[in-house]
């Protein structure tokens, strides 16, 4: 567990650097989607969640579901760094026969969900919380959904289910980067007012800067104990931290190459070296 915020911020940069290396070497990967949720995932694994590295299926652990599963590459360096993958582990990202693909697989230690189509992970998370509550477990389930993912009807079915069943052990992080592949969400199909919509379905809601680890941690610590599920809307930018990719359209699913890749890696490396 990391207790110092500056150290945690530096860890975010370290994880981003390793994530970008994986995608650059593979020539593919959802870099921008991974980077918009990097601070959320890092704060979860290094500060917020309870788990046992040497016992990945410990019954009282907190669970994490990356519903916007194409961004799962950000979790691989974290699992490696924490020791879930064993000593001297190698992440063979996008290689034939490797479990480390653009979408997560449960066969990877520490991964709770084999991902695929959008809109599925939140329903899985709701089912987990429902089962945990039947067993009187206090374990929490954290899930990241994308704002573009909110165009899936199954997301709203899951939200309705969570509110109706008072799934208060559910914490949803909504990665509000306001972008899809080709346009901004509010141009394509308006999502706002998202906070009001979640509250109408019986959720507690908060809104934070999704690139501020301290705000993310404080939001989890301030969750009301009132029997309601929770949504933390995280305002983010796709590709945050890479000048050539941040908040840029048509960068979805694209790994930088050549000079752009070199500049991106240098940009992150400089922040790491400066302790940011």
Annotate the PLM regions:
Residues 39, 70-71, 177-178, 212, ...:
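Glycine-rich beta-alpha junction loops
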Residues 12-28, 175-177:
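N-terminal capping segment at the start of a domain
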Residues 1-15:
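N-terminal hydrophobic or amphipathic helices/low-complexity stretches enriched
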